[in-house]
């Protein structure tokens, strides 16, 4: 879809009031009006408790329907409320992407005793003990669900490792011992082998496990009528399984079923290798672009803005790039904290929303606010969304000649007249002369991002002098 926009419709610190699905339903019309075409919803199944953001996934088959872990609803609401929210979004032609947490399971119902080997947390290929008995939280029986939808039960033979020995009360990384059992291959090589992330780590070499997860995938797509998945923590999951999972889903639901993977590593080579390994079955979040923007926001005028797209997916493999500014993991106080500083947030959104390439993803925290505090950025994001919808079409020409002042020109096409965005990290006001085309001679262009600049008249050479204030952005469009 041309000029589509995704929104991550949650942040880490949402209230545990069970009303999030209701809020989403009520917001559907507004999301459509601002140009949102896809909504990434949080993990919608039962976690370790009602407070779980969703990444401590306990029972994928419980979408807020069964009394488990002390609650029927999830943090976000009930299954019925979720279904109603999705139906409302679909009325406005907005796709829904469910966050799929397939790497691990949390909140086991019972412990089991089994042989394990402790490994070095800094290199999981190095064993630091002989095999010994531990008591691990690996037995999942889902008593509250009572076999509805799936009778599958989980035990230690279906996992690769845990991080806690209940017998000794000791934390560590324990690799489960069994026939042909080892860490999954086809994962990131960080820490030797980055199969293990948290909780009870699922063994994707086990055929029964693969079939159960694929069965769940097909079921949840049909049950909720979702249009895609956001695949969590893919660098910890066997890449062959990831390709198989998405292929099998599409065999049932069609090639248009969407997927974007979270591979959190600022290494373009690794991300390109991953795309190749999974046969380009999924898009990826552009982590490299996020970190470039993070560095730019920290280093202010010392950052060379001409390098903002260096080592990014959107530059190297644009059809697979989901561009984003921040998310629940990068927001302040989170595990992978790297939040873009406030002054640069408008720059960052201008770079992703006015660009030709990439599928841009808004962050709930940037748009609505974090922890109940209203975001100061909503007005500028709204303005950029308006320009994306009404002006940002055609080819993209980057004017990256000055380390502190850069410009992006969308040339326009058909009835859409294009736009110019000028971005500055300089500590002084600037002006940049750009050629927008001789056919635009005499046109009047206005600045719409709140600078208060006088209009620009395009001269007989098709050029205009576009201004920008210190450390600000200016967005110019043809005046009607």
Residue spans of the language-model regions?
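Boundary/entry segment of secreted carbohydrate-active catalytic domains
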Residues: 1-18, 196-205
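Core domains of carbohydrate- and sulfate-ester-processing enzymes
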Residues: 118-193
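Active-site-proximal helices and loops of the catalytic beta/alpha 8
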Residues: 2-5, 23-33, 43-45, 49-64, ...
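Substrate-binding cleft of carbohydrate-active enzyme catalytic domains
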Residues: 74-108
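Active-site-adjacent "subsite" loops/lids of carbohydrate-active enzymes
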Residues: 178-218, 223, 234
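Active-site-adjacent substrate/metal-binding segments within catalytic domains
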Residues: 5, 11-19, 23-25, 39, ...
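Soluble non-cytosolic domains of exported or imported proteins
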Residues: 15-22, 76, 80, 207, ...
């Amino acid at each position: 879809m041309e000029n589509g926009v995704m929104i991550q419709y949650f942040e880490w610190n949402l209230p545990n009031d069970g009303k999030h699905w209701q809020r989403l339903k009520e917001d559907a019309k507004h999301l459509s009006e601002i140009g949102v075409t896809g909504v990434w919803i949080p993990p919608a199944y039962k976690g370790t408790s009602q407070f779980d953001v969703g990444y401590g996934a306990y029972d994928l088959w419980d979408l807020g329907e069964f009394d488990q872990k002390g609650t029927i609803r999830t943090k976000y609401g009930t299954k019925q409320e979720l279904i109603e929210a999705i139906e409302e979004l679909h009325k406005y032609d907005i796709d829904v992407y469910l966050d799929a947490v397939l790497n691990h399971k949390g909140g086991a119902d019972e412990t089991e005793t089994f042989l394990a080997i402790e490994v070095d947390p800094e290199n999981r290929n190095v064993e630091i003990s002989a095999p010994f008995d531990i008591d691990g939280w690996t037995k999942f029986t889902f008593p509250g669900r009572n076999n509805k939808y799936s009778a599958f039960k989980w035990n230690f033979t279906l996992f690769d490792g845990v991080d806690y020995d209940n017998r000794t009360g000791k934390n560590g990384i324990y690799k489960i011992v069994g026939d042909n059992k080892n860490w999954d291959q086809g994962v990131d090589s960080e820490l030797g082998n980055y199969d293990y992330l948290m909780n009870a780590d699922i063994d994707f070499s086990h055929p029964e496990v693969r079939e159960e997860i694929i069965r769940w995938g097909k079921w949840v797509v049909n049950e909720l009528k979702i249009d895609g998945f956001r695949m969590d923590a893919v660098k910890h999951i066997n890449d062959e399984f990831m390709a198989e999972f998405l292929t099998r889903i599409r065999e049932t639901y069609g090639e248009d079923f969407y997927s974007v993977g979270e591979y959190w590593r600022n290494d373009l080579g690794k991300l390109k290798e991953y795309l190749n390994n999974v046969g380009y079955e999924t898009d990826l979040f552009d982590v490299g672009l996020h970190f470039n923007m993070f560095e730019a926001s920290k280093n202010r005028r010392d950052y060379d803005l001409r390098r903002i797209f260096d080592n990014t997916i959107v530059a190297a493999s644009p059809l697979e790039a989901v561009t984003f500014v921040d998310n629940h993991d990068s927001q302040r106080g989170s595990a992978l904290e790297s939040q873009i500083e406030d002054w640069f947030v408008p720059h960052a959104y201008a770079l992703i929303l006015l660009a030709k390439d990439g599928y841009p993803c808004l962050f709930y925290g940037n748009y609505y606010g974090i922890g109940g505090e209203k975001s100061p950025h909503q007005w500028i994001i709204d303005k950029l969304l308006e320009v994306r919808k009404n002006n940002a079409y055609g080819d993209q020409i980057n004017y990256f000649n000055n380390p502190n002042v850069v410009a992006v020109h969308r040339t326009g096409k058909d009835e859409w007249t294009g736009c110019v965005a000028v971005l500055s990290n300089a500590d002084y006001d600037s002006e940049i002369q750009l050629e927008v085309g001789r056919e635009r001679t005499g046109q009047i262009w206005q600045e719409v991002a709140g600078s208060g600049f006088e209009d620009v008249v395009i001269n007989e050479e098709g050029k205009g002098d576009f201004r920008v204030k210190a450390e600000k952005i200016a967005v110019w469009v043809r005046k009607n």
